[in-house]
Amino acid sequence: MRKIFFVLFLSLLTSCSDDKKIDEPQITIGDNYDKKAMLVNWAENIIIPAYKNYQIEVNKLLEEVNTFKQNPTIDNLNKLRVSWLNSYKAYQHVAIFKIGKAEDLYFIGHSNTYPVNIIELNKNINTQNYNLTSLTQFDKQGYPALDYMLYGLADTDNAILVFYTGADALKYRNYLTDLVTDLKNNADLLLKDWEANKNTFISNTNNTSSGSVNLIVNAYIEYFEKHIRLGKVGYPAGKFSNGIQPNKIEAYFRKNVSKILLNEAISASADFFNGKYYSNNQTGPSLKSYLDHLNVQRNNKLLSTIISDQFSLIKIKNNALDDDFVSQINTNNNKMLEAYDAMQINVSYFKVDMLTALNIAVGYVDSDGD
């Protein structure tokens, strides 16, 4: 019955799409793929190791904050900045997995909402009256807030240091500490939750909206579409506005690490698709091997190969960008739009071809018509 239903589903989908002239994926019907093995690989070799590394980097960040708090020097400020970037890069590998506790904690919102609301952030500092666990605090905390605190308070390092040594130094030091403590608390909670519920995640192989594969695949595509394609590139490039918005780049005050963070996120997405272990180059059961098992093709070419080739093109387009996205947007925004378009192609492969082949429905709100 399941095979018959799926054939009817594909027939209906094809008939509804004739006017759009979209090439449908060619699929060998019959899904006996070992989803449990894939879930084991995801949990044990990718997700949990990524969270462990993230926790390590956040702990280092807190250590550097405490050192700087006790001895606010230029040298300690620079060490703190290095740790901030390392932690920010590690975050790109765990933000993908917005399911369960990460969704409950609004992990992405608390960690990486930008641009920063500078006026309200400074009000937090001055009044010392804030609760960073509140949903109203997203744009006053996380890595973007640290970006402002470490790079945006003034134009020079010496001038920035005055905020941490002057009359209101304690307020600034406390806010800096609270920002990182909030990141640490969430990192600890998320790793603990994954370790405690790993077996439940692995055993949930049902092909339903609450099944582990469905949840992860939807989270994966949503993050790629909304937070990488749109958040890191589309919004600042003015894709859905009347003009460019360079103030909306990631790490606006540091500026020349936006490409680093974008490339880190793209690598994390490509690695997950291929089932690459977080800690080494070994690979295991994955979306790629799942699609290959089903022999999913587009124009007589394996869909997994098409997606992988597109990831390579995305990296080429991204590497052509200036390290400083503000400069890139202001001087030649077309390159930003080309990078966006390259990512959009994989969004289409994910949402049209891959989800159809895996018989998974889109489980999040699609707000921009893709």
Can you annotate each of these PLM segments?
Residues 12-15:
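C-terminal motif of bacterial Sec signal peptides marking the signal peptidase cleavage site
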Residues 2-7:
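Sec-dependent signal peptide recognition
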Residues 17-20:
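Bacterial signal peptide processing site
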Residues 24-370:
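Mature extracytoplasmic or organellar-lumen-exposed domains after removal of signal/transit peptides
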